[in-house]
């Protein structure tokens, strides 16, 4: 036997040429028990183990191991016997007539090891040789011929003693094993061997890698012999049930990592994967033979072979592998075997066209309720006695939805139809063999297509209507054709008419539905081969049926298949509308839930905190919600379509009560967007038809200035018509703020309600929000031309934050307190001062409205007013970011201090006409005298110029706000300077604290408060207002603690708890310094004069202490003023006063929050303003009137 030292490539095949001469049958040696020498049997393989692995299951291989290293011919070995082996890479290269052999005299002693698979010869007795099984006995060769030069003869001189025991054992086995001992590799037929010419061609490595191979491992019942290279005996005893390691051929210990392997290879593979070992590349062309005796020589090739035989990297775990792993893998293999059986059965079923056709037709008739017979009776009944359905909204083209139908009812009504399509898909031959992912992909993509094909017969074009599932008839003109839904309705009816004109049979409809579902071009499919095969077979069945039913229409099938793209387009449009509706429907449900909660808690809000006086606490929540923001290009022009803005300025005209909208949107069913408008939730204010369709039914209250300038829509509100009279009086307000960059006053003041707080949520009207959702289908139907596009102003900002929304609400409450003075006391006039938001001079509302309505969008953008304040625009843009909030707080303080130091007494404004409604009115335009005084003061702030200017000259400072602030600001203090200043102030306070008194009795008494020398501007103000006597009570100066990182707004709320209880013009005891302590927030960027040097010097009872006079209207003087957030507030009639005072405390952290309410009958009517110290900005500055019957309370805040 010749064993090759080098292993050849597995793709090569080995050709075994053996010659048996007549002299081979000579008697053997005397010591042999047998009298005849058996012929030679050839088996290919690299080694004993590899040959053993190639044997089929349940095959005895005892005879295979009889010759381990040499042929047992002994001295009787015929020298003329030649056994030649040559590598062949292609079966076609094997000569069909055999290979000639060289004479033994040419090279009788030459022995060359060929680099190919080794050859093992096994002798077999001719007496037991049979022909009914496949054999590999090589034919006897003819007289020797010339051989090619590359063939060499085998050595034929071998010792005899080594083989006597083996031959005896072989003969013993030959007597008990009559079956052939040499089998072909698994999976190969006998025809693969070419016996002609004595040449047998066997692939060297031809095992199919299938799970069945696991069962084909050889069962060893003898001892494995060593090879010719002197390898020691393996001495592996097999008990008849043991398999070999797939990697090295050793005894397998179990099923490890997906294959049978020994403990050594199992541990080697686990260590290699877990430790991620990178072995050195093999130096022998990566083709090392991995055996038990040399498996540790080349670790690179060993790991490579582990992976090649099927060891799984994913199966490697840390810790003990459970026993269920083997069971799972075996179950998967069995399942794979079953799947292959099912695939073979499926192939048979798909190839049988009549059987496939019968299966699909049976599935269609069992799962479809809309066959020809059923639909024909339904259509006839609908034509004879129609029962028309007129739904306000349509949930589905074939399912009329009553107004109060819920989503659950709709789903339950339509679920069985969808279930029928799913069951039909499951009954299509081959569908159950697909993976779950492929099933889901096909059903998700083709469910609507197949459903629409089934329901296409429900469209009756003769009466231009739809027969619904419940038998009712719905006319086409009854369907709401709003927005882009008109295109979908028209396309649906056209497609239905086109399909119905083909007059398809049930078999054709069923096969067409199957083709629509089983389509191989869906994205995400994995088993494309099976799906394509199913599609082609189903298409062939449809072609057969069409040819059978319509022999005169050869192009009918192509015409039918051309409808599939249109069907997919309709499905896409339907899906888009469904997605849009789901998003908006969820938002509507959320808003309705908010409305219910707010309606239940509206009274509690009046008694809990001053925030109840805001227009609606939910408006703040809406502002905080990211869905509340609408881009400026999508915001509707709600201002110009509302009747409130069409009234003359200052004229109150009552409008007749109009009908409220029905519960159309509140009870919107699931698929409202399918055939109805783009969305019932969007109140698109069409300017062209708002008088008869939009605003005639509902009053949409919203600020155009807020929509266009700020770019932020805080939930347009639908209110009762009883509030239209209140809203008609604020037409001047919309235009007074139309160029306000922030727009907070306009939006919030319009949302301010009457004192009873019967706002729109408690009244039951629905609130809608325009969403940032994509357009429904992208196909415009032409009815959008009347929509008012938003004026795209340069000051728009699509950013907002919860804090800015709260600031807007606080500004609203300031304006509310001011308006109550004007309403109840027309002789008074108030200027509303906001540290950040500043109103602009008003323009003609009619002229601007006509300009905007008559101009295209592009002209509106080009003719937009210029930016008045670029710095405010940047501040608005950076507002949502947290890292700019600290800087914004400092700028607020700067603006507050500047406003307080520059407010003059000539800011008296004249109100318009007397208002009878408690809705707050807008800020009136200041007279030219006040504007001139404001422009002439060089120390005035940007905020004050925004308030008082009426000429273009006054806007120079606001146009250069940064320069103006820089010129007005004093040098900034470094942190060290601030610390030294605070230490000095603390020392001064300690010296003056001994003379302080914390009790007050009576109206005119004052407790001494510590104060430092004010800066020059403050001194000037003190000299100016020193003669003005005020009645106030101040508590002891609180301790100041420098906390640059504290938030002034949040920390100042704790200082607003100074209790004030007075029944009749009496002051209450003020809080102690500990009760009213507040962290003092001083900014290094502060530019005001007051914040740099806080007041620290003591003042007498009659000294001119810098005071701020805040006028607040309280109807009942007997009701005390309570600024505590935790204690209940007074009734709503006094709510505006509380909010105004609370705002002053919350917004100005540098103020002392010691508040006292006293009764006063006013002062001279010609007084312009109250004292305004430099360190505290006024929230509302005005003058009392002695002719008033109601008491006007003065809330005094100490600076």
UniProtKB/Swiss-Prot annotation:
GO terms for molecular function: DNA binding; heme binding; nuclear receptor activity; RNA polymerase II cis-regulatory region sequence-specific DNA binding; zinc ion binding. It is found in: Nucleus. Residues 993-1006, 1018-1040 have a biased composition (Polar residues). Residues 352-600 form the NR LBD domain. Residues 139-149, 162-172, 641-653, 792-804, 831-845, 897-942, 950-961, 1041-1077, 1086-1104, 1159-1187 have a biased composition (Low complexity). InterPro entries: NHR-like_dom_sf (IPR035500), Nucl_hrmn_rcpt_lig-bd (IPR000536), Nuclear_hormone_rcpt_NR1 (IPR050234), Nuclear_hrmn_rcpt (IPR001723), ThyrH_rcpt (IPR001728), Znf_hrmn_rcpt (IPR001628), Znf_NHR/GATA (IPR013088). Residues 130-182, 624-665, 771-808, 831-851, 895-961, 991-1104, 1155-1188 are annotated as: Disordered. Its main location: nucleus. One of its GO terms (biological process) is regulation of ecdysteroid metabolic process. Induction: The expression of this protein is developmentally regulated and is correlated with the 20-OH-ecdysone induced activity of puff 75B. Belongs to the nuclear hormone receptor family. NR1 subfamily. Implicated in the regulation of ecdysone-triggered gene hierarchies. Probably plays a key role in mediating the regulation of the larval molt by 20-OH-ecdysone. This is Ecdysone-induced protein 75B, isoforms C/D. It comes from Drosophila melanogaster. The gene is Eip75B.
